[in-house]
């Protein structure tokens, strides 16, 4: 079993939660193709800057219950940089835990092993849709308190 941190925005977090589907862009096809049934996905919501500032959150944990499949139906909201993106490479999910309130990701950074540069931590996530994390980081996250 593998553990994945999946990076999304607030709008697509709502889609993941409601439809129990995770999807990535074409350019991340090779990454999602490593995902197997039974793997755990931790949903990370990016921070929002400006006057509507929100910190980065851990929103929930899901188990993968399907093989990767391609579906170009428009259920996810595209990013402003790529307005035609449909995130077609997808897996179906089963909810393990949704954090209410969500967990502030910044509080976890000092303890997470996969983040080796604690000052420039966002570099470990930039440009990625998802990344594999160690089991001990997964356990730390799911046991965290908001």
Curated annotation (Swiss-Prot):
* SUPFAM superfamilies, sorted: PUA domain-like
Domain of life, source organism: Archaea
Record Pfam families: EVE
In terms of Gene3D superfamilies, this protein maps to: ph1033 like domains
Q: Which residues form a coiled coil?
A: none
Q: Note the PANTHER family from the entry.
A: UPF0310 PROTEIN MJECL36
Q: Which family would the database say this protein is a member of? A: Belongs to the UPF0310 family.
Q: What is this protein called?
A: UPF0310 protein MJ1382
């Amino acid at each position: 079993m593998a553990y994945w941190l999946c990076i999304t925005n607030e709008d697509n977090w709502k889609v993941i939660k409601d439809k129990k589907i995770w999807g990535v862009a074409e350019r991340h096809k090779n990454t999602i193709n490593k995902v197997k049934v039974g793997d755990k996905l931790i949903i990370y919501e990016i921070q929002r800057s400006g006057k509507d500032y929100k910190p980065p959150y851990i929103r929930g944990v899901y188990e993968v219950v399907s093989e990767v499949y391609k579906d170009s139906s428009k259920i996810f909201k595209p990013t402003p940089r790529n307005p035609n993106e449909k995130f077609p490479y997808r897996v179906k999910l089963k909810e393990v835990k949704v954090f209410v309130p969500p967990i502030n990701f910044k509080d976890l950074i000092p303890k997470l092993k996969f983040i080796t540069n604690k000052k420039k931590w966002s570099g470990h996530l930039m440009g990625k849709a998802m990344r594999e994390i160690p089991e001990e980081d997964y356990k730390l996250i799911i046991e965290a308190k908001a």
